[in-house]
């Protein structure tokens, strides 16, 4: 890159002084300095006077110089704009190399706020693009809390009953499936209502409850299909 910049500067100098071109010996260093335009900085001129200097010195001189973008430069040669853009690119790279370590050190020293900012970044973008959707997301925890609160309010009488009278609460827990069944299927609920006295009787006597569990399929069959239940009784008597 330094060689290209040096070539551009030489072409610029030759194009600016083509009318006053003079042949000089090769060993002389004066032609290069005399061919340079007067508006170039003295630092570049000093670099060009000594051809033994390395291209890295030339690159440093161009990066440190401040070439003004005057109309005269644009009229004489469009190559100066390319030189200026190269200088700006070099400065931007140097600035980036200086700033990036500082940013990394700040991020490592204060990682928690940096991670929090990264987490909140989608929400900030959403609030900018769609404020209504952002507001709904902000209200979402309150909606969930309101739902849980309403459920607690529904269960509050049962909790109070369980604290005051555990026996009555246990009875309500036993009857709760029947209440749900009544809401879903009224015919099945009426069937369960017919069996309710048996449940209450067997709840007081666990041994009888076990017998009921064994006889429950036959009882349900007798309620749904009396003819089939009668046939099962006949078959059972014949077997025994």
Swiss-Prot record:
The keyword Acetylation does not apply. It comes from the Eukaryota. Keywords: Repeat, Seed storage protein, Signal, Storage protein. The keyword Signal applies. InterPro entries: Maize_Zein_Storage, Zein. GO terms for molecular function: nutrient reservoir activity. Residues 1-21 form the signal peptide. The alpha zeins of 19 kDa and 22 kDa account for 70% of the total zein fraction. They are encoded by a large multigene family. PANTHER family: ZEIN-ALPHA 19C2, ZEIN-ALPHA A20-RELATED. Belongs to the zein family. Zeins are major seed storage proteins. This is Zein-alpha A20.
